[in-house]
């Protein structure tokens, strides 16, 4: 009879009922899958009684497995196998058939294939499971291809025993309805009618479902080649195909798969989660099975590797490379066996998480199990290798951040310089408070080149600090200076100006008096009054000339005399004090050598023909110039104070400013005190006759062509500042040296006159 390449197996667990007369039947075992052509095992002969029921137990040794190339049963366990036999009692008569029922999982015959002889089989048939009920009726199960003579289609049949004639096994590969054969009204109805439906709904064991899942995976991959749902779909096929086989046993496998795929597409994701979880468990089983196989190989040694299937497991299964890929995302949950066998333990990752310098315990294991390691084992230490230490750049960056947060510097912690350089930490080097930033230095140079900026900076520099800084022997007491600056912070602007004015007058006049032999201008009212009396009693020769030539004009200016005296004193005090502070050679070196920007005096009496009183001019012009200068002088008392306080803050720029020259030269053109002392001389009724020393000086002053020589000698208290301003701003050094002896002689005479 025709067969599709797989045969039922009768193992040693066949149960027979003893009797007087025995029947003989022959069965063919299932052929195990092999890469080459299958070798057909020999036939097995069993003796059964002729009248009793024949019940064959389940196959305990080798379960039914799927055949190669989609042929053979794809379910685990045995199914309904119908065996025909004849008894040997009596003469030859129509055969008396008995049915043997084997009860286990349903047998699913797969896609069509070829016979051993090359003849195509009909489409497969899905058979339902049947309970183990003994069949006693003489039911004959036959087929259209059955014959009494033996196996058809070229299958060799060994010679039967002389007293028995074996009927062929009916192949379940016929998808057509079971026809009514020559042996009666046979069909599947008797066996299905006596089956209990409750037994068919019993849940199968997990192991059987796992084997079915392994067999369904190739079918699922064929329909979903590149989908991650292959394992879940294989789990979905287990109950669906089982239900379809119960509902319609004549349905082919292709039809069942098509309906199962349609059901899978209409299933929601929530309902699919059950099959995903089942697939996860099956993948874990597969991984554990593979690890057990590898463990058994390691125990036997790498020299003699056993066959890939263990003795207790089914030989037919997925290849090893397929299973190796599965444990990557589904690790085993069966205790400590899995990490030691295949999966890497999580312990080698702990050194990277906690401390890098701790050696991982993993490298010690290859030495202990060196003889049992598989070939891919030596590559795993390289995969789980972790860095032994943290990079020094990261450590140094962390140290820098912590030092910056804590406010400490590398030098404070005692860290050597070499370690800081090794950590590649560059810090700006500062020497004496000067940064080496080229951009900052260029910006400072640019600011210093601006005259307005320099002027503003000079205005805020403390004079004491500047004096000590520019002195040849700087001995500055920074503590005293800081205390003084703190005291000055609480003063108002007027108090601050007055304090600096008094200090500058004391220091400046103290330095100018021993050099030029002049009377010191103190802040005490007695000395200041004595200086004023000396100036009033000894008028200048030019003042006498102006008084004699134009008494009405000078008398007319008499009410303004007192104001002019105050203004002249205020204008003369500041330059005298500040010019006295210019004696140090450092200040002269700092003083710019450029010529004065504006020699035009603020008062019209300076530098004009009327004010200078050149020979040949009428007295009216002189008096007119005096009157004009005195009228403008009344408008300046407030401005002189402001300008004087401004110039106290920048003493070395007096030669460029027009204010000192306006303060030193009177508006009347007669010298610094010419316009100031002429009204006071008229008030007090001074004698118009000049002293002999003054008369002797009269001609050279009027005869010299330069304006500096036309200026008369000032009074005793202001003559030093007048000479210095003329020597710096208007005349050369030779002219100041030429007149140096004459003022000293006149001062001595005036001092003697005051003492008398």
UniProtKB/Swiss-Prot annotation:
Compositionally biased residues, Basic and acidic residues: 417-427
Region: Disordered, residue numbers: 173-200, 293-438, 511-639, 653-756
Biased composition (Basic residues): 746-756
Ranges annotated as biased composition (Polar residues): 543-560
Transmembrane domains' residue ranges: none
Top-level taxon of the source organism: Eukaryota
Any Pfam family hit: NUT
S-S bonds: none
Start-end of Pro residues biased regions: 304-321
Biased amino acid composition, Low complexity: 654-665
Stated family: Belongs to the NUT family.
Protein name (record): NUT family member 2F
Organism: Homo sapiens (Human)
Primary gene name: NUTM2F
């Amino acid at each position: 009879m025709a067969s599709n390449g797989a045969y039922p197996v009768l193992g040693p667990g066949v149960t027979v009922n003893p009797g007087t007369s025995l029947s003989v039947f022959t069965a063919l075992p299932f052929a195990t899958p092999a890469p080459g052509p299958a070798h057909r095992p020999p036939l097995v002969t069993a003796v059964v009684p002729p009248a009793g029921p024949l019940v064959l137990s389940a196959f305990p040794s080798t379960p039914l497995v799927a055949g190669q190339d989609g042929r053979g049963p794809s379910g685990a366990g045995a199914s309904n196998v119908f065996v025909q036999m004849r008894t040997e009692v009596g003469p030859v008569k129509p055969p008396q058939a008995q049915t043997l029922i084997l009860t286990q999982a349903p047998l699913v015959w797969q896609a069509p294939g070829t016979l051993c002889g090359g003849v195509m089989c009909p489409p497969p048939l899905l058979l339902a499971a049947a309970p183990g009920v003994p069949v006693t009726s003489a039911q004959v199960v036959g087929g259209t291809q059955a014959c009494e003579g033996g196996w058809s289609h070229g299958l060799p049949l060994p010679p039967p025993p002389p007293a028995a004639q074996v009927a062929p096994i009916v192949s379940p590969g016929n998808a057509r309805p079971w026809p009514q054969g020559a042996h009666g009204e046979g069909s599947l109805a008797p066996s299905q009618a006596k089956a209990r439906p409750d037994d068919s709904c019993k849940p199968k064991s997990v192991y059987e479902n796992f084997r079915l899942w392994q067999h369904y995976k190739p079918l699922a991959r064929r329909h979903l080649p590149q989908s991650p749902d292959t394992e879940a779909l294989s789990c979905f096929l287990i109950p669906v195909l089982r239900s379809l086989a119960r509902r319609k046993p004549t349905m082919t496998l292709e039809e069942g798969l098509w309906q199962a795929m349609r059901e899978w597409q209409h299933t929601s994701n929530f309902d699919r989660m059950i099959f995903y979880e089942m697939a996860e468990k099956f993948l874990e089983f597969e991984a554990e099975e593979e690890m057990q196989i590898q463990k058994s190989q390691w125990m036997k040694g790498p020299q003699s590797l056993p066959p890939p299937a263990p003795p207790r497991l089914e030989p037919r299964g997925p290849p090893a490379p397929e299973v190796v890929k599965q444990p990557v995302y589904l690790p085993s949950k069966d205790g400590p066996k899995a990490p030691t066998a295949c999966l890497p333990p999580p312990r080698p990752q702990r050194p990277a998480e906690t401390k890098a310098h701790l050696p991982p315990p993993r490298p010690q294991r290859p030495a202990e199990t060196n003889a049992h390691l598989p070939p891919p084992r030596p590559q795993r230490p390289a995969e789980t290798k972790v860095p032994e230490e943290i990079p020094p750049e990261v450590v140094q960056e962390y140290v820098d951040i912590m030092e910056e947060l804590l406010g400490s510097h590398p030098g404070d912690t005692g860290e050597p310089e070499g370690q800081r350089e090794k950590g590649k930490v560059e810090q700006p080097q500062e020497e004496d408070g000067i940064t080496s930033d080229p951009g900052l230095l260029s910006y400072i140079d640019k600011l210093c080149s601006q005259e307005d900026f320099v002027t503003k900076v000079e205005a805020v520099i403390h004079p004491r600090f500047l004096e000590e800084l520019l002195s040849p022997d700087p001995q500055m007491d920074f503590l005293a200076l800081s205390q003084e600056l703190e005291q000055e912070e609480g003063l108002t602007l007027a108090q601050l100006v007055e304090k600096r004015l008094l200090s500058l007058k004391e220091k400046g006049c103290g330095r100018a008096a021993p050099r030029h032999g002049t009377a010191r201008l103190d802040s005490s009212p007695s000395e200041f009054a004595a200086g004023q009396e000396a100036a009033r009693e000894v008028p200048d020769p030019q003042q006498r000339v102006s008084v004699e030539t134009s008494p009405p004009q000078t008398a007319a200016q008499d009410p303004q005399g007192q104001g002019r005296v105050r203004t002249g004193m205020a204008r003369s005090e500041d330059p005298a004090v500040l010019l006295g502070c210019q004696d140090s050679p450092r200040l002269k070196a700092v003083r710019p050598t450029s010529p004065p920007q504006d020699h035009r005096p603020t008062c019209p009496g300076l530098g004009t023909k009327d004010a200078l009183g050149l020979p040949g001019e009428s007295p009216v012009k002189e008096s007119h110039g005096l009157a004009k200068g005195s009228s403008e002088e009344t408008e300046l008392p407030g401005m002189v104070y402001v300008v004087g306080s401004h110039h106290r803050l920048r003493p070395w720029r007096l030669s460029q400013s027009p204010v000192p020259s306006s303060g030193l030269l009177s508006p009347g053109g007669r010298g610094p005190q010419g316009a100031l002392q002429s009204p006071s001389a008229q008030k007090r009724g001074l004698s118009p006759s000049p002293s002999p020393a003054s008369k002797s000086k009269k001609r050279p002053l009027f005869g010299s062509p330069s304006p500096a020589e036309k200026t008369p000698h000032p009074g005793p208290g202001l003559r030093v500042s007048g000479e210095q301003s003329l020597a710096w701003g208007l005349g050369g050094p030779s002219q100041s040296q030429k007149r140096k002896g004459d003022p000293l002689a006149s001062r001595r005479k005036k001092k003697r006159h005051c003492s008398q």
